[in-house]
Regions:
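Carbohydrate-active catalytic/glycan-binding domains of CAZyme proteins
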Residues: 1-492
Length: 492
């Protein structure tokens, strides 16, 4: 297969380049110099041995195309040589305010700019705490939300930094039940429903205040395929007022991926889970959830993700966010977490004739291991973090029983005839089968690996058109050997 005229897919999921690591993303729509764009503000996982980094960067995309992301540069630098944790940015009047969290989030400062891409300057220390989320209401009043294991909120004074007297509220929603060894949670305001952990983010939709946050499930949930101490959930609550009256809504998304039923009847998730932080945004009538996922063998190389969601309010005022079911009258009746995909804003699926990096896999499992907090606690495969301009991030440590899945691929109106896979550092005797729609689906192509060979072409065994999930299943008679690294694939 001739690859020289093929280009790598851009703006898939993760939607930033695969070498970029911006977790905790807060998406905002701002108009500047006559152009309306989506701006994302997050942490910056550049230290590689701990969370976050010493600068924060801005990426933006035109509202007409959320696959076309532009690097707008560094917007804020560490003030003290310590990592900057999750920020937020809002606009009031002609000024943009960044709420940055220096010294690993131990304090919050507010800095200003006339440009949504920054730089944000003249930082002033605020009275806020960990993981600030800011809401500028329709009447111009400003509210702040923050907290780690306990949730707080308050109205801000006109200085955008200090709390208006008498407005501070504590324990505004119940938090998760217990500590995990390195943190403690008091018991009086805990429950298993709201289960607030961190990552406050506020939106106002149709007169409703929406509180988005990271939810921690301290006990294992076998029916959801999740281990104890899972905090990959983004959950939401809603209210008719900004400082109280919150009603639990449900789960918007989970960075552990799809739910899989195993042969023995147990369930597991399709992707190594870890912490989560994000929010929702409407762009040209379509709602999206922004969040992050893990790569590597720890939580220090996270990547920015987005997926489609619906948002609706029924006649009683109940808010639904995620994958919504409607009755025959078109009224919302239930919602569930949205799926985690490889396509992101490529709504029709990733172009099968382009080069598709294995780093876009949204499913990465083995036969024997269930969902793990992240890959260091297993012997399983993982997406290798890349930095400094690499166009592809490979899957490595692939052993027999590994499955890598991609939701979704556009195979076109005319079936391709063959598939090419780049499989580095291969050993002899590995078997790779390409399966349609599920890990146990119809096999449409297969190759056998050879020592020292990296490029493999296989004819398709049947005609396939349209949009499908694809799963690559790796097998070998020796269950202990690393079969290969998986770099990219393409069809022709």
């Amino acid at each position: 297969m001739d690859l020289k005229n093929k280009k790598y897919i851009k703006g898939a999921n993760p939607y930033m380049p695969l070498w970029e690591h911006v977790p905790d993303g807060e998406p905002r729509v701002f108009t500047y110099n006559g152009e309306t764009r989506v701006y994302v503000y997050g942490s910056h996982d550049t230290l590689r041995t701990e969370y976050c980094g010493l600068d924060q960067v801005v990426w933006s995309a035109p509202v007409s195309d959320l696959t076309d992301w532009r690097y707008d540069g560094v917007c804020f630098h560490s003030m003290d040589g310590e990592p900057l944790y999750a920020p937020d940015v809002v606009q009031k009047g002609d000024t943009f305010y960044m709420y940055a969290a220096p010294d690993r989030g131990s304090k919050v400062v507010v800095a200003k700019s006339k440009n949504p891409a920054g730089p944000f300057e003249d930082p002033v220390e605020t009275e806020l705490g960990f993981d600030p989320g800011i809401l500028v209401d329709d009447d111009g009043r400003v509210y702040a939300y923050w907290g780690f294991t306990s949730a707080y909120c308050a109205e801000l004074n006109d200085d955008m930094a200090t709390i208006k007297p008498g407005t501070l509220r504590e324990h505004i929603i119940p938090h998760c039940e217990r500590g995990g060894g390195w943190w403690e949670a008091e018991e009086e305001h805990a429950d298993k429903v709201f289960s607030f952990f961190e990552a406050s983010s506020l939106r106002k939709i149709g007169g409703k205040y929406i509180y988005i946050y990271s939810r921690r499930q301290c006990e294992a949930v076998p029916e959801e395929g999740l281990p104890a101490d899972s905090n990959g959930y983004l959950a939401y609550a809603y209210s008719d007022e900004p400082l109280g009256g919150w009603v639990y809504g449900g789960i918007i998304s989970n960075n552990a991926g799809e739910l899989i039923e195993c042969a023995d009847g147990t369930k597991k998730r399709a992707y190594p889970t870890g912490n989560n932080h994000g929010s929702i945004i409407e762009v040209n009538g379509q709602w999206y959830v922004f969040y992050h996922r893990m790569t590597g063998t720890d939580e220090f190389a996270r990547q920015a993700m987005l997926d489609l969601i619906d948002v609706a309010v029924d006649g009683s005022g109940r808010v639904y966010i995620g994958r919504i079911e409607y009755n025959e009258a078109g009224e919302p009746v239930s919602s569930a977490e949205t799926e985690m995909t490889s396509q992101g804003a490529h709504i029709g699926g990733l172009d099968s004739r382009a080069l598709i990096s294995a780093g876009y896999a949204c499913c990465l499992t083995s036969e024997t291991e269930g969902t793990t907090p992240f890959a260091e606690s297993s012997a399983g495969a993982y997406i290798k973090p890349v930095y400094e301009g690499a166009e592809s991030s490979p899957i490595v440590r692939i052993k027999s029983g590994t499955t890598a899945g991609f939701r979704y691929i556009d195979l076109g109106t005319e079936s391709p005839k063959e598939i090419y896979m780049k499989l580095d550092d291969a050993v002899s005797g590995g078997r790779v089968s390409v399966r349609l729609d599920s890990a146990d689906g119809e096999c449409i192509a297969a190759v056998t690996t050879e020592q020292g060979k990296s490029g493999y072409t296989a004819a398709l065994e049947c005609e396939v058109t349209g949009k499908h999930a694809l799963y690559f299943r790796f097998e070998h008679d020796d269950k202990t050997v690393d079969i290969c690294g998986f770099d990219f694939f393409t069809f022709e």
